[in-house]
Amino acid sequence: MTDAQMADFGAAAQYLRKSEKERLEAQTRPFDIRTECFVPDDKEEFVKAKILSREGGKVIAETENGKTVTVKEDQVLQQNPPKFDKIEDMAMLTFLHEPAVLFNLKERYAAWMIYTYSGLFCVTVNPYKWLPVYNAEVVAAYRGKKRSEAPPHIFSISDNAYQYMLTDRENQSILITGESGAGKTVNTKRVIQYFASIAAIGDRGKKDNANANKGTLEDQIIQANPALEAFGNAKTVRNDNSSRFGKFIRIHFGATGKLASADIETYLLEKSRVIFQLKAERNYHIFYQILSNKKPELLDMLLVTNNPYDYAFVSQGEVSVASIDDSEELMATDSAFDVLGFTSEEKAGVYKLTGAIMHYGNMKFKQKQREEQAEPDGTEDADKSAYLMGLNSADLLKGLCHPRVKVGNEYVTKGQSVQQVYYSIGALAKAVYEKMFNWMVTRINATLETKQPRQYFIGVLDIAGFEIFDFNSFEQLCINFTNEKLQQFFNHHMFVLEQEEYKKEGIEWTFIDFGMDLQACIDLIEKPMGIMSILEEECMFPKATDMTFKAKLYDNHLGKSNNFQKPRNIKGKQEAHFSLIHYAGTVDYNILGWLEKNKDPLNETVVALYQKSSLKLMATLFSSYATADTGDSGKSKGGKKKGSSFQTVSALHRENLNKLMTNLRTTHPHFVRCIIPNERKAPGVMDNPLVMHQLRCNGVLEGIRICRKGFPNRILYGDFRQRYRILNPVAIPEGQFIDSRKGTEKLLSSLDIDHNQYKFGHTKVFFKAGLLGLLEEMRDERLSRIITRMQAQARGQLMRIEFKKIVERRDALLVIQWNIRAFMGVKNWPWMKLYFKIKPLLKSAETEKEMATMKEEFGRIKETLEKSEARRKELEEKMVSLLQEKNDLQLQVQAEQDNLNDAEERCDQLIKNKIQLEAKVKEMNERLEDEEEMNAELTAKKRKLEDECSELKKDIDDLELTLAKVEKEKHATENKVKNLTEEMAGLDEIIAKLTKEKKALQEAHQQALDDLQVEEDKVNSLSKSKVKLEQQVDDLEGSLEQEKKVRMDLERAKRKLEGDLKLTQESIMDLENDKLQLEEKLKKKEFDINQQNSKIEDEQVLALQLQKKLKENQARIEELEEELEAERTARAKVEKLRSDLSRELEEISERLEEAGGATSVQIEMNKKREAEFQKMRRDLEEATLQHEATAAALRKKHADSVAELGEQIDNLQRVKQKLEKEKSEFKLELDDVTSNMEQIIKAKANLEKVSRTLEDQANEYRVKLEEAQRSLNDFTTQRAKLQTENGELARQLEEKEALISQLTRGKLSYTQQMEDLKRQLEEEGKAKNALAHALQSARHDCDLLREQYEEETEAKAELQRVLSKANSEVAQWRTKYETDAIQRTEELEEAKKKLAQRLQDAEEAVEAVNAKCSSLEKTKHRLQNEIEDLMVDVERSNAAAAALDKKQRNFDKILAEWKQKYEESQSELESSQKEARSLSTELFKLKNAYEESLEHLETFKRENKNLQEEISDLTEQLGEGGKNVHELEKVRKQLEVEKLELQSALEEAEASLEHEEGKILRAQLEFNQIKAEIERKLAEKDEEMEQAKRNHQRVVDSLQTSLDAETRSRNEVLRVKKKMEGDLNEMEIQLSHANRMAAEAQKQVKSLQSLLKDTQIQLDDAVRANDDLKENIAIVERRNNLLQAELEELRAVVEQTERSRKLAEQELIETSERVQLLHSQNTSLINQKKKMESDLTQLQSEVEEAVQECRNAEEKAKKAITDAAMMAEELKKEQDTSAHLERMKKNMEQTIKDLQHRLDEAEQIALKGGKKQLQKLEARVRELEGELEAEQKRNAESVKGMRKSERRIKELTYQTEEDKKNLLRLQDLVDKLQLKVKAYKRQAEEAEEQANTNLSKFRKVQHELDEAEERADIAESQVNKLRAKSRDIGAKQKMHDEE
């Protein structure tokens, strides 16, 4: 805009845009783009600098402060050239980066230009001062301006939203966001001001609203803001007028854009501010406005003073604000109430409740003595507040101190402490203020609601900005959460939806992730188990506190969510309990009192008093609040329940916020970003780090980037074509129908713009930023040029008319002057004087004769005039009828245009669907490629697995030798499995057959459809040929030779195309061979897959058998272990006996030592006893050794069997895994092969479709070629006719010239006669009179001829113009047909390789046409018969298609059943995965237990060593026993008793062995039963497998059984381990028993020593006993060795278990990985299969429908083309006739010119005769009398010529009648065409271009028809004129003859 245009903004211009001079100075400042840059700075973020040098990736620069810095090269950012200084749209910056945006805003802010565009949204910086940019002058200047036509402003954003609402018919919203103190409220007020100014309702509405002491609606909308600000705004740390509530103002408009109504929604009033403020803040403005003493009557009414410090609720912070005048604001608030229609009672109620809240804060309470209850400490303030609220003061105090609480069904009076009372007062004050505020909003909405119709709205959102204070509580969390949601909405709209729009429209676009997703923080707050959810949960628990809430927050989110952190508490600051990372920064929150704030409880006793208040407003506020009393009564009376009062603050806020977001999503948003320049509220100062932080958080840079990279402007194709066609009308011709998209493409490609700045979508054209503005400028410039040209032409035409009048005046004056001069020259002649004297006296007979002749001539002229009038009336009637027919045709054309538009819309819809389907196909192809890659990987794995499988087969052969015992069971189960596999194979074969049948049916279906299409094509072509033959029989008779020539040309083209056809057939054969090869490969793959499946099933059976064997061995091991335990118990008993005996032996040895000198008798007795004792001991030792040997053998056997079975299981598991992998790979290969086959089938179908389309095109080209040939023939015939007519006209012209020469000679003879009659005065007088009369008549005739000449010249010019136009059209038609023929031949040459066969068919059709010319009726009947046959075939094919559809549905049902079974197997697979995970945990437990067992083993080793040492000590003691033989006698009796006991113990051991054997037998029986049960279960499982009929189920079952076996084996190992630990414990007990027995034996030896002294006789026996004891020692040593062997075996077993555990862990990991892999593959394959099946079916159906409709439309379009060609032929005929008439006209004009020339010569001769002529006339009168007879003869000849000319005129009239007949024929043809076009209405969807060309041709024909009618009218008028002229000439000739 220039300075003159900026003058419209008045004083605001300098704050919106700098002057041209200042801008020019700024742009011409010195600037070096290579050195000017930005460098980072610690304090200022970025500073301007100049580059001094560059060294090794470092840059040395000098800042503008003179400081030299060295930075990395990638940290240096270029400055923009000076032309971009203070640019209004930052998206236009050359170098877009953070410092460029920052300094642009900073420089504009320094110049007080606070508004700046940033791509699609606007950025505004708070100026902290008043600027004159919002007055009415600025509003008027911005009204109706485009964004690019005016400087940035909030008014421009508002006007754009208003215009979008009117043009797009869509609701709009303006989101004004920013941090607290950024200026949101001011901008909101300006937006409302703008809408109220520009869209005000009419005068009637204003008068109506002005009634009842109210303002107009726009005034009420504006005044709602100060009323709400007084009660909802307050001073905060960052803002003196901060909105402490959010509001969404909806301004409703009518259909014409007039203001209709408005409403306001509010969110989250900060009610805690009513009772508490920080030091630097203050309460809501209304309190201080009331206390300003501007209205003293208010202070008296409210019983308050004007000192705020007298009231605790309003004096906790500051009480005054420098920038706010409370007294003036009070008057504004009061007047706003009046404008909004508040009654005086309502105003008084609002003020009273506000004053009562102030008194509430002054109420004092104290604690009763010796009680915790509170009592009032004075009642003055309570009395005041109760008075203002309409309550009883005593009831109020009682309700506060002793509220009634419902306990069960009874009410109890509860005592309150002082703290509780104060809290209750605060809660009541907050509730009263909040409800009063909400009531005010409702009341204002009721005022703003009008009954006028409303259609659209513009919403303005002003909500509390992001807040980070020193003390952040629950209110700050809610506010910040709201801002987080709004920022997320902005990000989603700007970055996600914008890019999704590009994808949806098919524009090539790479998705850009701007990293602006805030969903994590939002989920942390609002999702289940988020902060709000935990707060709600804690509010429901009665014993919950703030600390429990904190603990739950920490447990659920600390360390788990990145946005939740633990704060760092700093001394001197408020305590914080948790921190949240918001988009605008990290905020520390204090949770004290959150539970109470969320629940917001009220004293129900006081609330009940409120409901009964005498103040109407107070009772209204709490009428809907449900207390315990009202809740009970409500149940019986049907009143409102208490549920609403239980809704928490957080839940209510989230509900309102969700409603707001829903409303915003339904509108078109416009964003305004408000920025805080500094924290000090200093005008003109910008804090770079603060502003930079806000820009980063608000996504300003990202918004600019996507605006630059993306396409922010988009227009529908139809709208763009309609609006911008004026830029180049030639690109989109007026008479043609062109698709909107194609027209847009042509238009844009023809314009001189950057073609990379726009993209074409499916439905819209997309523009980069700035291009649409450039197009608008081009359009405005074009309009101005067009209007200027029109004005110039109009002025020129007016001046030409004026000039013509001036020339006419000049010519008239010249004629008058010439006549006067001639008269003056002859008036003094004697003869003239005599003539003047004699003329009045002469009354001769000549005059009478002349009068008679004149009368006769008048009669003739009158008759001709009547005839011409009758002829004219007839022609006028015909013209009226023709005009009527023309109008009818135009109406029909308009209807057809509407139908074509509908067809175009349907075609656009089909194109959209096609594009969507193509996208789906592309996606499916990508998935197919991924599957092929996976297939390649799986084939590689398959090869590896095959190698491993060969190795495993060898291992299996080795294992089969060890499994001879279970071979019988194996064979039995194998037979069963074989049966199952055979059945499964049978099922697979059935499925394969079904698939083959399905494919065959599909192919048959496709073939049937193709045949049907071919037959339909034949029917259509035959019907077309029939119509053509019926219409062109007459034409074909005269053009047989032309057709023969065309046929020869086509035959040559046919021979060319036949070779190409052979090539295409060979390629098709190659494709079919490839198809057969692929089918064979597919069959081989299926056979391999079946073989692999059978192998897998065999391996699975083998694994099951091995698992059964393992179970049996494990059961057997358990039985052996039980036997081993029994043996151990028996051995323990024997050991106990042995220890007793050894103890007795020691006692005997001691006694023997004491009785050393015993007798030999005693010695012998001792020997006998010793021998018996030794025998018993040997028996016992042998029994124990035998038991130990058997136990060791069993253990070893068990360990070996366990190891072997474990290895077998491992091998089988590996084999099974490999086979499963192979199976999955084969399945994937099978799927790939099937997909390839489907693709090949699709490709073949597409090729067939392409061939059919090309054949159709060849037919069309052939038809067009024939039409072009016929038109050329017509041109040649017309040319010959015109030549003959031209010759005839030339002959006529020569005759007319001869006639004119005769007339001239007659005139000369007359003049000679007059010279001869000089003497005869009377004759001379007669001659003079005759000459005078002739002069007058000649002059009259001259005038008439001049007029006729002018008319004829004009008509000639018109006819020449028409003729030139016709000639140009003929040339255009000729060139068009020639170029079309050339193009068509070129296209035929290009497509000849595919169209030979169709061309041959076309040639045959041509020959058939030539043959049918003679026998048309026979052909007609034959065609009808063929059509009937074809209809029968169509019905058959339809029946076949229906049967195929039925089979397809059955197959789909089978497929659905298989899918269901597969999903069941998937669920079982998931359960097996869970069990595998539980097994892994058990493995870890086993590992720990194993480590503990190793520790126990070490302890056992140490104890074993101790036992060996003790045994050596015992042997030494027994060696000394020989001295104690005497004492052995005493012990003998005891030993016998002990022997008996030992025998009984042995018997018990034998009994226990028998018992254990019985247990073994029972266990074997149970094992057999279990085995039978397992077999039965296996049989049931087999039956289930038979029912399942699927391969995946077997894989999952095998995995499940293997996992179960693993769990059981691990459990068995664990149990064995536990048993071993028990054995070791028992061994420890036995060792302790042995020690104890050794001690007792020592005592016995001491006692026996005394006996040995008495039995020295038995010393020899004692010696033998000593030897026996040595043998016992050897036996003990052997036992020790056995124990060591057992320990070693235990070690081996532990090692074996460890190996098996590791193998099991590895297998478990592999199994889990494979299970996960299979699960993921299965799920992905299932999803892909479902999608592909659904997409495939949809695609097939839609493609078939589209192809069918396309073919039908093409056929109909071809018919329309032929009809249009016929019309073109008729048009050419009409043009020939018009050309003929034009030539006739030229000839007539030439004759008229010659006649006029000769007439002029005669007049000159007559005028210049004078005296000489009179003398000559007198001399030659006699000569002329002689020549008169000859002249009469010549006159007779001229009469004959006249008759000839009349005959020619009759011929011309006949020719015009023929033209009329041609017109009627053309009209009939048009009528037929209209009928055909009506029949083609619904079938022209895929024939847009052809239909468009047809329509354009039709319009041209219609236009030419009109021109032909005009030319016919002109020709008729010319014929009439020629007749009139001929009559005049004949009359004159007769006159001359008579004279």
From Swiss-Prot:
<keyword id="KW-0505">Motor protein</keyword>
<dbReference type="GO" id="GO:0007522">
    <property type="term" value="P:visceral muscle development"/>
</dbReference>
<dbReference type="GO" id="GO:0007512">
    <property type="term" value="P:adult heart development"/>
</dbReference>
<dbReference type="GO" id="GO:0005829">
    <property type="term" value="C:cytosol"/>
</dbReference>
<dbReference type="GO" id="GO:0002026">
    <property type="term" value="P:regulation of the force of heart contraction"/>
</dbReference>
<feature type="domain" description="Myosin motor">
    <location>
        <begin position="85"/>
        <end position="780"/>
    </location>
</feature>
<dbReference type="GO" id="GO:0030018">
    <property type="term" value="C:Z disc"/>
</dbReference>
<dbReference type="InterPro" id="IPR027417">
    <property type="entry name" value="P-loop_NTPase"/>
</dbReference>
<feature type="modified residue" description="Phosphoserine">
    <location>
        <position position="1512"/>
    </location>
</feature>
<feature type="modified residue" description="Phosphoserine">
    <location>
        <position position="1271"/>
    </location>
</feature>
<feature type="domain" description="Myosin N-terminal SH3-like">
    <location>
        <begin position="32"/>
        <end position="81"/>
    </location>
</feature>
<dbReference type="Pfam" id="PF01576">
    <property type="entry name" value="Myosin_tail_1"/>
</dbReference>
<dbReference type="InterPro" id="IPR014751">
    <property type="entry name" value="XRCC4-like_C"/>
</dbReference>
<dbReference type="InterPro" id="IPR036961">
    <property type="entry name" value="Kinesin_motor_dom_sf"/>
</dbReference>
<feature type="domain" description="IQ">
    <location>
        <begin position="783"/>
        <end position="812"/>
    </location>
</feature>
<feature type="binding site">
    <location>
        <begin position="178"/>
        <end position="185"/>
    </location>
    <ligand>
        <name>ATP</name>
    </ligand>
</feature>
<keyword id="KW-0122">Cardiomyopathy</keyword>
<dbReference type="GO" id="GO:0001725">
    <property type="term" value="C:stress fiber"/>
</dbReference>
<feature type="modified residue" description="Phosphotyrosine">
    <location>
        <position position="1261"/>
    </location>
</feature>
<dbReference type="GO" id="GO:0055010">
    <property type="term" value="P:ventricular cardiac muscle tissue morphogenesis"/>
</dbReference>
<dbReference type="GO" id="GO:0060420">
    <property type="term" value="P:regulation of heart growth"/>
</dbReference>
<comment type="function">
    <text>Muscle contraction.</text>
</comment>
<feature type="modified residue" description="Phosphothreonine">
    <location>
        <position position="1284"/>
    </location>
</feature>
<feature type="modified residue" description="Phosphothreonine">
    <location>
        <position position="379"/>
    </location>
</feature>
<dbReference type="Pfam" id="PF00063">
    <property type="entry name" value="Myosin_head"/>
</dbReference>
<feature type="modified residue" description="Phosphoserine">
    <location>
        <position position="1139"/>
    </location>
</feature>
<feature type="compositionally biased region" description="Basic and acidic residues">
    <location>
        <begin position="1925"/>
        <end position="1939"/>
    </location>
</feature>
<dbReference type="InterPro" id="IPR001609">
    <property type="entry name" value="Myosin_head_motor_dom-like"/>
</dbReference>
<feature type="modified residue" description="Phosphoserine">
    <location>
        <position position="1309"/>
    </location>
</feature>
<dbReference type="GO" id="GO:0030239">
    <property type="term" value="P:myofibril assembly"/>
</dbReference>
<feature type="compositionally biased region" description="Basic and acidic residues">
    <location>
        <begin position="1826"/>
        <end position="1837"/>
    </location>
</feature>
<dbReference type="GO" id="GO:0055013">
    <property type="term" value="P:cardiac muscle cell development"/>
</dbReference>
<dbReference type="GO" id="GO:0055009">
    <property type="term" value="P:atrial cardiac muscle tissue morphogenesis"/>
</dbReference>
<dbReference type="GO" id="GO:0030017">
    <property type="term" value="C:sarcomere"/>
</dbReference>
<dbReference type="GO" id="GO:0016460">
    <property type="term" value="C:myosin II complex"/>
</dbReference>
<dbReference type="GO" id="GO:0030049">
    <property type="term" value="P:muscle filament sliding"/>
</dbReference>
<dbReference type="GO" id="GO:0014898">
    <property type="term" value="P:cardiac muscle hypertrophy in response to stress"/>
</dbReference>
<keyword id="KW-0963">Cytoplasm</keyword>
<dbReference type="GO" id="GO:0005737">
    <property type="term" value="C:cytoplasm"/>
</dbReference>
<feature type="modified residue" description="Phosphothreonine">
    <location>
        <position position="1311"/>
    </location>
</feature>
<feature type="modified residue" description="N6,N6,N6-trimethyllysine">
    <location>
        <position position="129"/>
    </location>
</feature>
<keyword id="KW-0514">Muscle protein</keyword>
